């Protein structure tokens, strides 16, 4: 039997530290905001209270053998529930609800949210280390900024969307491998899992990957040279990888789309602009998000955003890569400002609530750009001193404090005033209703 080498143990310890730190920061946020289970402010708000808790109560009964996954009278007059399952409940984290009593479903939601944040930190740290060969402190800082970006913190009310942030870094590295090494398998598997866990956010992710893979291609040809044969080969491989991923997951998303295609608001004429310039600017700043003013959730840590912006003016980077980076950034910002672009990202439908659903893509792109910048700093003797742990660790501490403060401000708007005692009664009613109608 071979023993794990020292490098393996260090990696395990690093990823364990990423997971533990994010979970601890999440728990500290709940304690500071007096959010359940550390206070009377309920963790159930908006859709979590009025939709998800009913679904989780039903799904728990399914897992315990007390209800049928395919059919439920609790849906009204009785209907097939496969569409409900594949859209709301397909995340593997939801299997844990069977371990919680019916009256502790709020605690279950809190627990899986903590687990998901820890997994986002792990996957994004793995990505920047693999893609840019960054040191562990640098990878920790950037991945923490992505994990606790404003979009994530303000959208914990939609737990089905969060799984996408775990898989997006893996998909992105799959694009890198496809362009550089012609390998497709990672992108195929990650795409299939993304669709199976939540096809709605997977659709958004796949559209983004169609743009992101072009960035990786431009960066590659800036280094190796362009040819039409190369472009055709990589385009066919990318299309094939996405198609295979969709084929592997078709058993879950095709019935769902057919079940849900009969309803929902379709495209309609409306204002061209979704928000104001003032709100866009506020969206990039810490502690400035306002829930009722259509503020896009662009903020993802000042250090990471500054590193990302510095890529655009770094002359050691190919002008083609810098121009492509600027174009993609403009597209992602415009997607939260212009209604036609928002409709494209949302499946040609008018989204109902939860403004700026694609802002997490800009945060991830900032992660990529910041990682690219640090990779360059690491390779330049004159700038290498700024890359030392003695410099990065204090910046990491400041980033953690800054992200915590921003999240605290956001949570005070989202969770204050929602009494856990009131919501506990609602959960009990929902559980009893589900039990008597399934």
Model-inferred region functions:
Residues 18-30, 305-309, 330-334, 394-407, ...:
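Hydrophobic core of alpha-helical transmembrane segments in multi-pass integral membrane proteins
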Residues 24-124, 144-166, 204, 260-265, ...:
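Membrane-interface coil-to-helix junctions
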Residues 1-34, 233-237:
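Start-transfer (signal-anchor) and selected internal transmembrane alpha helices
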Residues 113, 117-127, 131, 136-220, ...:
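Membrane-embedded helix bundles of polyisoprenyl
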Residues 1-7, 130-134, 176-186, 216-233, ...:
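Membrane-interface junctions at the ends of membrane-embedded or membrane-associated helices
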Residues 46-59, 78, 92, 230, ...:
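Periplasmic/ER-lumenal interhelical loops and adjacent helix-loop junctions
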Residues 194-196, 357-365, 378, 385-438:
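Membrane-embedded alpha-helical segments of integral membrane proteins
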Residues 111-119, 162-170, 206, 299-304, ...:
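Membrane-embedded alpha-helical segments of multi-pass membrane proteins
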């Amino acid at each position: 039997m071979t023993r794990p080498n020292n490098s393996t143990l260090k990696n395990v310890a690093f990823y364990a530290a990423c997971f533990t730190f994010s979970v601890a920061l999440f728990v500290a946020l709940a304690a500071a905001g007096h959010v359940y289970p550390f206070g009377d402010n309920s963790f159930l708000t908006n859709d979590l209270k009025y939709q998800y808790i009913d679904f989780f109560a039903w799904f728990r009964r399914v897992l315990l053998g007390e209800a049928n996954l395919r059919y439920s009278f609790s849906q009204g007059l009785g209907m097939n529930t496969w569409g409900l399952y594949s859209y709301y409940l397909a995340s593997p984290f939801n299997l844990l609800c069977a371990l919680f009593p019916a009256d502790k479903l709020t605690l279950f939601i809190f627990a899986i949210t903590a687990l998901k944040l820890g997994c986002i930190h792990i996957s994004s740290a793995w990505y920047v280390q693999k893609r840019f060969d960054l040191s562990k402190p640098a990878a920790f800082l950037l991945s923490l900024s992505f994990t606790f970006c404003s979009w994530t913190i303000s959208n914990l009310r939609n737990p089905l969307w969060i799984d996408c942030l775990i898989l997006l870094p893996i998909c992105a590295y799959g694009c890198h491998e496809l362009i550089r090494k012609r390998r497709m398998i990672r992108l195929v598997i990650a795409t299939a899992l993304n669709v199976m866990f939540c096809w709605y956010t997977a659709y958004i992710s796949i559209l983004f990957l169609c743009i992101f893979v072009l960035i990786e291609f431009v960066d590659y040809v800036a280094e190796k040279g362009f040819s039409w044969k190369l472009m055709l080969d990589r385009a066919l491989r990318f299309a094939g990888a996405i198609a295979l991923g969709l084929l592997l997951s078709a058993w879950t998303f095709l019935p769902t789309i057919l079940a849900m295609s009969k309803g929902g608001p379709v495209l309609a004429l409306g204002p061209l602009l979704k928000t104001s310039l003032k709100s866009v600017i506020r969206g990039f700043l810490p502690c400035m998000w306002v829930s009722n003013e259509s503020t896009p959730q662009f903020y993802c840590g000042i250090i990471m955003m500054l590193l990302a912006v510095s890529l655009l003016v770094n002359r050691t980077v190919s002008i083609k890569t810098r121009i492509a980076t600027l174009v993609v950034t403009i597209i992602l910002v415009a997607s939260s400002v212009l209604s036609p672009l928002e409709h494209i990202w949302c499946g040609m439908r008018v989204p109902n609530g939860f403004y700026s659903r694609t802002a997490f893509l800009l945060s991830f792109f900032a992660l990529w750009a910041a990682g690219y910048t640090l990779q360059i700093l690491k390779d330049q003797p004159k700038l290498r001193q700024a890359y030392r742990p003695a410099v990065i660790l204090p910046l990491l501490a400041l980033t953690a404090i800054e992200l915590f403060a921003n999240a605290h401000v956001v949570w005070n708007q989202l969770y204050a005033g929602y009494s856990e005692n009131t919501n506990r009664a609602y959960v009990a009613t929902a559980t009893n209703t589900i039990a008597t109608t399934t």
